[in-house]
């Protein structure tokens, strides 16, 4: 009869939470790193053979003739331990946002030695948000810019490998007067450019980015693809697998690898300490995500289930990118609007016909005006509410929680980016004619900008680069303009606001001979 053999690191080595990296303890339930200690007095499952042995134990010959069921005695490998906070967040989507404290960039930067090799990660779908100009301009670091989640923007590998990097090089030179060592665009889901990224890594690398920028997922993809290990202990250079880890590897390579992976969650600030990994002969440090929230956290307003949809790339359908199915909305004098879950309300000018392709999970809904939409969705939350499936906000959210954004005048299609949420494309149909300004009412705490469609600028930059070096010839990104809820003349307010930022915009336009075209109030500043 064969009994289970248990492999556990609980008492054989000092361990951290396999998800967030803090030291585990089982004495103080309310303190940091608490986990529920497993009872070691395990009772083996009683099988029919056990019962037979108890009844006929003295009949040895009869026992030998019986068929022994060893199915319940297979080797069992324990999963890596995680703290209670991470367990509730990862498995039950239950968490207190105050426990996931924001970490300023300055604190993260202190953990990076001077002259280190830095991999700065940012999701390409929310470009140009999440790009840290301070980090890119820091000459004491050798920085590689790595964009993640490319499958949520681009249809194929060619766009990612050959087209968009040309535009990115020109963009950084134009808008930031700075260059990363290189720009690499990746997708862990489709495994785009993972080998390219690894080939550019140095002996020691520090992965830096904002929460949910995809750095931990990127590290996990490299660990799986190239079979790396998580370094436990402080002696990084001389790290070797101990006997227990070697036994685990011998029993199950797949299970062993799962224990090496970085903690990944749609919840920001899950990682709290620096964690090290070794892939072949290269060392990777995963640093906590940094953020500086000066306003409300979106967790206070948006339903946790909707936030999970927005942030989890694995549940995003690529059909949205490839098929580009659109919703239409015709503007009118009453302020007809279109919303996604009450998170934003788009109000087009009267008589304009517009096509919206939303790359954010959720269903769109139209209302008579923003007041009506905010009133209806603000009362949802109960299962009986007829529009509950369209509501992504918590009950009781009123108009005072929204910021009124004005989109600067534009020609042709644009993409509207909502930081930490996603983006949607907006295309007015027919011949261009100015009929008014587009408004966007967005929950406070969500940054908004607009950009030229990334697929289009990627293809355009690639085509023009075949004739020589590519230069950006028109503004490609812009902030929106914030106006008061009751502002009767937003166009005048936009003009006055533009005069305040015009000097910086004109400096860029004149330096690189950019042409304004119809985007004559576009501006962007980090």
Swiss-Prot record:
Annotated transit peptide: 1-14
Similarity section: Belongs to the TRAFAC class YlqF/YawG GTPase family. GEP3 subfamily.
One Pfam match: MMR_HSR1
Gene Ontology molecular functions: GTP binding
Transmembrane segments annotated in the record for this chain: none
UniProt name for this protein: Genetic interactor of prohibitins 3, mitochondrial
SUPFAM superfamilies named in the record: P-loop containing nucleoside triphosphate hydrolases
Keywords for the protein's UniProt record, in alphabetical order: Mitochondrion, Transit peptide
GO BP, one annotated term: maturation of SSU-rRNA
Subcellular location: Mitochondrion
Protein's organism: Candida glabrata (strain ATCC 2001 / BCRC 20586 / JCM 3761 / NBRC 0622 / NRRL Y-65 / CBS 138) (Yeast)
């Amino acid at each position: 009869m064969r009994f289970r053999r248990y492999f556990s690191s609980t008492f054989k080595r000092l361990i951290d939470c396999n998800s967030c990296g803090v030291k585990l303890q089982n004495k103080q339930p309310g303190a940091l790193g608490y986990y529920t200690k497993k009872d070691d007095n395990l009772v083996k499952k009683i099988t029919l053979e056990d019962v037979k042995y108890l009844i006929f134990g003295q009949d040895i010959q009869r026992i030998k003739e019986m068929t022994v069921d060893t199915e319940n005695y297979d080797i069992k490998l324990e999963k890596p331990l995680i703290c209670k906070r991470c367990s509730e967040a990862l498995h039950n989507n239950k968490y207190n946002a105050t426990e996931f404290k924001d970490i300023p960039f300055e604190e993260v930067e202190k953990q990076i030695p001077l002259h280190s090799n830095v991999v700065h990660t940012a999701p390409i779908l929310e470009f140009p948000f999440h790009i840290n100009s301070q980090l890119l301009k820091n000459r004491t670091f050798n920085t590689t810019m790595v964009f993640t989640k490319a499958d949520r923007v681009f249809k194929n590998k060619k766009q990612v490998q050959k087209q968009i990097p040309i535009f990115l090089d020109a963009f950084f030179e134009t808008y930031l007067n700075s260059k990363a060592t290189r720009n690499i665009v990746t997708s862990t889901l489709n495994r785009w450019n993972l080998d390219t990224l690894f080939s550019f890594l140095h002996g020691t690398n520090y992965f830096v980015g904002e929460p949910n920028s995809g750095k931990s997922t990127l590290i996990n993809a490299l660990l799986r693809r190239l079979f790396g290990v998580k370094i436990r202990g402080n002696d990084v250079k001389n790290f070797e697998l101990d006997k227990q880890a070697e036994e685990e590897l011998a029993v199950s390579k797949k299970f062993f690898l799962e224990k090496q992976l970085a903690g990944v969650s749609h919840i920001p600030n899950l990682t709290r300490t620096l964690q090290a990994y070794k892939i072949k002969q290269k060392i990777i440090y995963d640093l906590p995500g940094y953020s500086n929230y000066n306003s409300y956290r979106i967790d206070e307003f948006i339903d946790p289930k909707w936030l999970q949809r927005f942030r989890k790339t694995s549940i995003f359908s690529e059909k949205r990118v490839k098929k580009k199915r659109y919703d239409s909305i015709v503007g009118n004098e009453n302020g007809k609007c279109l919303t996604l879950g009450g998170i934003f309300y788009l109000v087009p000018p009267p008589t304009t016909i517009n096509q919206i392709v939303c790359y954010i999970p959720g269903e769109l809904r139209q209302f008579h005006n923003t007041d009506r939409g905010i009133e209806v969705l603000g009362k949802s939350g109960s299962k009986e509410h007829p529009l509950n499936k369209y509501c992504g906000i918590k009950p009781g959210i009123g108009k005072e929680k929204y910021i009124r954004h004005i989109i600067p005048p534009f020609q042709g299609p644009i993409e509207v980016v909502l930081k930490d949420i996603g983006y949607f494309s907006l295309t007015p149909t027919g011949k261009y004619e100015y009929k008014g300004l587009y408004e966007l009412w967005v929950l406070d705490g969500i940054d908004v900008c607009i950009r030229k469609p990334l697929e289009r600028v990627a293809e355009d930059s690639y085509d023009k680069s075949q004739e020589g070096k590519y230069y950006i010839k028109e503004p490609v990104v812009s902030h929106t303009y914030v106006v008061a809820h009751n502002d009767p003349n937003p166009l005048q307010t936009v003009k006055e606001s533009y005069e305040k930022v015009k000097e910086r915009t004109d400096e860029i336009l004149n330096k690189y001979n950019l042409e304004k075209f119809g985007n004559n109030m576009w501006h962007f500043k980090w």
